[in-house]
From Swiss-Prot:
It comes from the Eukaryota. It holds the Pfam family Dicty_CAR. Signal peptide: none annotated. GO terms for cellular component: plasma membrane. The keyword Transmembrane helix applies. This is Cyclic AMP receptor-like protein A. The lineage of its organism: Eukaryota, Amoebozoa, Evosea, Eumycetozoa, Dictyostelia. GO terms for molecular function: cAMP receptor activity; G protein-coupled receptor activity. Keywords: G-protein coupled receptor, Membrane, Receptor, Transducer, Transmembrane, Transmembrane helix. The chain crosses the membrane at residues 5-22, 73-93, 101-121, 147-167, 174-194, 213-233, 248-268. It comes from Dictyostelium discoideum (Social amoeba). Residues 23-72, 122-146, 195-212, 269-369 are cytoplasmic. It is found in: Membrane.
Length: 369
């Protein structure tokens, strides 16, 4: 299912971008003349020619210095997001025992976070083709990311409030939602030439267009779904009072905090852009670039740094990295322990029996490694 969606996605990109190139080639002369007329306005007065430079309609919303500041922010947040997402992805492939229903969803969430952070990097704005590619990549993978968080919330709700615990058959519906809806939004926005420069990156350029709503309205809906689900779960587990329930309560709170931190600045910025499109706020764009690409790292902290993954990594390092060191260390500890017991029980046992027991401990230790 995933391979079919991704191949369809790539095919549409190639076809549509190619058709755009053909149309742009036919209109080169017209566009060049229009650009020259917009760029230069000549006014002749008393044999004096005054040349006035006008702004290009494709200019960014901020100054060059502000764009450079936004680039520095996104380099930091995207790098952290990539590292966090890769941690979960590598852990998923490394430990077969950890591939449960929950970790599979977290894996696909991290996959979306990884590519979203990559597409946020400012390497795609030098040409129309690259700008369209960045816009499509961000729409597709950011939408997929927040839809996967919704699926995780739905799964938690089913576990806490119903008797349905076997959810593997739901995966086909989750894949359809989390890949199909973003694919439709990304392609329809490309067909109608909705992508352009906004802030310091390429996205759906018109903040009041229907295509922006196709992206942000589902995000707002998902935000409130997650909020309601997590409040309901906290209420449910608050009916019980023990250390395990308190721990679950803290974890659920972290889920909501991580999602809110990564998505709330984006929602606020989109509302401001929609209500006042001619007055973009640099601080809101900066907060969006700081936190939204960081989602892979935040999800790593919430979902990846858990007892299961940590135990798997401890076993992995003991088995493959520190095998010799750990084995020798354990041997020395056993020898010291046996020496102590031999000194204490020397009068009640002979040397041969003592050393036989020590050898047996070392052999057993080798068998456990």
């Amino acid at each position: 299912m995933i391979q079919i969606l991704l191949s369809t996605f790539i095919s549409f990109i190639i076809i549509i971008v190619s058709s755009n190139d053909i149309r742009s080639g036919e209109n080169d002369n017209f566009n060049n003349n229009k650009m020259i007329n917009n760029f230069l306005t000549t006014i002749t007065t008393n044999d004096t020619i005054i040349i006035k430079e006008t702004e290009s309609p494709n200019d960014y919303d901020f100054s060059k210095e502000q764009i450079e500041s936004l680039d520095k922010i996104v380099y930091f947040s995207s790098t952290m997001g990539i590292v966090g997402a890769l941690f979960i992805i590598v852990s998923f492939f490394l430990f077969k025992a950890a591939r449960t229903f929950a970790t599979k969803m977290i894996f696909f969430l991290s996959l979306s976070d990884l590519f979203a952070a990559i597409f946020y990097l400012p390497y795609y704005r030098d040409s129309d083709i690259m700008c369209n590619l960045q816009g499509m990549g961000l729409v597709f993978f950011l939408s997929s990311s927040y839809l996967w968080t919704m699926c995780i919330s739905i799964s938690l709700f089913m576990v806490f409030f119903t008797t349905i615990f076997e959810l593997n058959h739901w995966f086909k519906y989750f894949h359809f939602i989390c890949w199909g809806i973003p694919l439709f939004t990304a392609i329809i926005s490309l067909i109608f030439h909705a992508y352009g420069k906004t802030g310091s990156w390429c996205f759906i350029s018109d903040p009041t267009s229907i295509f922006r709503l196709l992206y942000y309205l589902p995000l707002i809906v998902v935000f409130f779904i997650n909020l309601v689900v997590f409040i309901a779960i906290r209420w449910k587990i608050s009916q019980h009072s023990n250390s395990l329930v308190s721990r679950v309560n803290i974890i659920v709170s972290f889920y909501l905090i991580a999602f809110s931190l990564s998505q709330l600045p984006t929602i606020i910025n989109s509302i401001q852009n929609f209500s006042d499109p001619d007055n973009p706020q640099f601080s809101l764009f900066a907060f969006q670039l700081l936190l939204q690409p960081l989602q892979g790292f935040l999800n790593c902290v919430v979902y990846g740094i858990n007892e299961g993954f940590i135990n798997h990594y401890v076993e992995f390092f003991e088995k493959y990295i520190f095998r010799c060191r750990c084995r020798k260390s354990r041997e020395l500890k056993e020898i010291e322990s046996d020496k102590t017991s031999l000194l204490v029980d020397y009068e009640n046992s002979d040397d041969e029996e003592g050393f036989d027991g020590m050898d047996k401990l070392i052999i057993d230790d080798y068998n456990r490694v």
